[in-house]
Amino acid sequence: MKLMLSLGSLSANSLPIEKKQQVLIDLVIRTYQSHERTELFKAITEYRKNQLIALFPEHANKSYSIIFELMDYRDLIERYPSTLSEEATLLEKVVGQCFMHWLDFWCECEIAAIKAKFPLKENELPAPQLLFEDSAYYGALVERVEDTQLMVQIPSHPQAMPLSDAITLSNLELFIQGEKWYEMLSLLSLSQVGKHFIVLKHPVQDSCPTLVASALIQNWSVRDTWLSYAPQFSNEQWNYCFPSYGYSEFTRLQLFTPSSLSKCYSLPEFDNEFKLQLSDTQAVCEVLRLTVSGNAQQKLYFLYLAQKELMSVLHQAGYKIGFTIIEQPFMLNFYRAIDAKAYFHSGYCDLNDDGKQTYRGFWNFEMMVKAFSNIDFRGYKRAVRASRKRGSLERDEHV
């Protein structure tokens, strides 16, 4: 009842939008326990997603960022009030007054909830200085982030916090707030548990190490939860493009029984044959959520450094092949400039019909380590520029 009164009062209040946003977020964080908040957000998300798909069935397979912007959110909740509960109806009404849509609000709540647990202190040391020197950082593989005692900070919030919270906050800021990958909101638990690769800045004068990059590493044993094998990423809409030398490289790496993977003609067929024939299951993993921090230039540097450290760390850990999903042009342009056997696509698809291709592919860790062994950030950028220029010339020739 107290929440209803607070929401009613806030709804009628003519506060500036940013102030109303903050008051609403604080109210929700104070009122609900973490698991209660998650259940509420998931319930309303599912309700509105199904409703929007019923209204616009031609967009049923699009991403949440497309689906939740098909209709003005305030118009949606006025024309189709929630039937979940009176509380949900009133909450959505206030959200509609100050946020783009429900998922935008969910993301901001999760970010605020983590920052509220570890508030910045006025007398703390200044934000860490992020150098463009490879030796100032180190990569590591953490088997279970939920069990580690390591405390770190991140550039956008220089306050010590558990590693799992730092990874989650980084994922929220980069992928959900930045890239609008709202599907990750209901899967935030994957950022808080399990095996993760991390890149840390050595704590020189800082109070604790600074997390500048991370990635989720999932073993073959949990392949049923892999994004690579989710229906959206393994269907006939994907263009199959696994190269002939990929088959040869897989044979050389001794991954299968029988030793040669059967030739395939579609991505679903390839995925099925891979699962049936794979015998060296310890050599294969999926790498997702490669997250980097900092401003635009720092992110490019940490993207280079994270890949360099990732390949080395996973190769040393005994992995041979890594499944990955990539949209990042900077990464793809670099891969075009190195040995073709170091990274190869298995398929590509324009998931949202917006002209942006998403690629499924494989990192060959042994070859990737060689590709990065004699290259620094300057050389990396030079290779990317040359690759981009070559690609532009090739496109011009076909016009």
Curated annotation (Swiss-Prot):
Give GO terms: molecular function aspect only. Answer: N-acyl homoserine lactone synthase activity
Q: Which Pfam families match?
A: AHL_synthase (PF17327)
Q: Which reaction does it catalyse?
A: a fatty acyl-[ACP] + S-adenosyl-L-methionine = an N-acyl-L-homoserine lactone + S-methyl-5'-thioadenosine + holo-[ACP] + H(+)
Tell me the InterPro entries matching this sequence. AHL_synthase
- Keywords in alphabetical order, please: Autoinducer synthesis, Quorum sensing, S-adenosyl-L-methionine, Transferase
The catalytic activity of this protein is classed by the Enzyme Commission as: 2.3.1.184
User: Biological process GO annotation list?
Assistant: quorum sensing
- The regions listed as transmembrane in this protein's record are none
The job of this chain, per UniProt, is described as: Required for the synthesis of an autoinducer molecule beta-hydroxybutyryl homoserine lactone, which binds to LuxN and thus acts in bioluminescence regulation.
**Family recorded in the similarity comment:** Belongs to the LuxM / VanM family.
Protein name, entry field: Acyl-homoserine-lactone synthase LuxM
* Biological source species: Vibrio harveyi (Beneckea harveyi)
Q: What is the lineage of its organism?
A: Bacteria, Pseudomonadati, Pseudomonadota, Gammaproteobacteria, Vibrionales
